[in-house]
């Protein structure tokens, strides 16, 4: 028998630690909490990030930047994904949702130019990148901003 051939016993279940059940259990008396102090008491302990009164790390570090409340987040669709649709179809946000290309519309849909397209399709979206616009129009398709 070698180390890598060792297997645990079948149907073996390690018994849980029963704290505070007598000295001979090994976890009696203080039950692993030490002697006195805040952590020995019920409900004791300090909140996360508390460093004993010292200025906590998250307060020592400088603040940075801000969150723009007016930021628009677009659902992104690449040109290569549009290639999966049949030629001549009109691709709208509803069609993209139904076909599960996007999970949600968010603040609109933006078509980006990754990949190639060789089908003549009409795409209706809120924004297009220059490359995406060029590729769709090169393939004979139409681009409509909604």
From Swiss-Prot:
PROSITE patterns: RIBOSOMAL_L15. It comes from the Bacteria. It holds the Pfam family Ribosomal_L27A. Residues 42-52 have a biased composition (Gly residues). One of its GO terms (cellular component) is cytosolic large ribosomal subunit. Gene3D superfamilies: 3.100.10.10. One of its GO terms (biological process) is translation. Binds to the 23S rRNA. This is Large ribosomal subunit protein uL15. It comes from Natranaerobius thermophilus (strain ATCC BAA-1301 / DSM 18059 / JW/NM-WN-LF). The lineage of its organism: Bacteria, Bacillati, Bacillota, Clostridia, Natranaerobiales.
